[in-house]
Amino acid sequence: MRLSDTHIKEYLNDGRIVIEPAPTDEMISGVTADLRLGNKFRTFHAHTAAYVDLSGPKDQLNKAMESIMSDEIVLDEGEAFFLHPGELALAITYEKVTLPADIVGWLDGRSSLARLGLMVHVTAHRIDPGWSGNIVLEFYNSGKLPLALRPMMKIGAMSFETLTGPCANPYNTRKDAKYKDQNSAVASRISDDR
């Protein structure tokens, strides 16, 4: 069952859900809590590789990922990140989110941004029970104009759904959890899938 705004506030107040810094009352409405854009980004370099073999040898995959991903870009206050049409970039939320083992989170982009062509998460919008960290966003500009993205702008909204019971294997206890406690725009760790 999705939590209402009343229950989101209740769960935040009693610490069952933690969002740091805590959202103001104005940031919680209906069934969501607003999240803002952080100041860390990562882009894809122009490259000449014909393809990236996602199931190939681990060392080759790591080498390919290193050649196509930029170092992390950290914006100073007042700076903007420009996402051009057809570009994919990674970013993080300003807020750190921590979920218990019996709640799953769902991140949705804002309709107002989607109407300008901005996809906030390409496919990964589930936030697993037991998650703790900033959320990495997979931005894609499907519009016709470059978009200026600034830290602290409202970027998405998160809803929360209670499970029938706590997970036996929440994210924070999994040995194979690749993005545990992330606080930066972490690139794909697909080579760790083995």
Swiss-Prot record:
GO terms for molecular function: dCTP deaminase activity; nucleotide binding. DCTP binds at residues 110-115, 128, 136-138, 171, 178, 182. The keyword rRNA-binding does not apply. GO terms for biological process: dUMP biosynthetic process; dUTP biosynthetic process; nucleobase-containing small molecule interconversion. It catalyses: dCTP + H2O + H(+) = dUTP + NH4(+). Pathway: Pyrimidine metabolism; dUMP biosynthesis; dUMP from dCTP (dUTP route): step 1/2. It holds the Pfam family DCD. It is an enzyme of class 3 (hydrolase). Keywords: Hydrolase, Nucleotide metabolism, Nucleotide-binding. Its EC number is 3.5.4.13. Catalyzes the deamination of dCTP to dUTP. Homotrimer. Belongs to the dCTP deaminase family. This is dCTP deaminase. It comes from Pseudoalteromonas translucida (strain TAC 125). The gene is dcd.
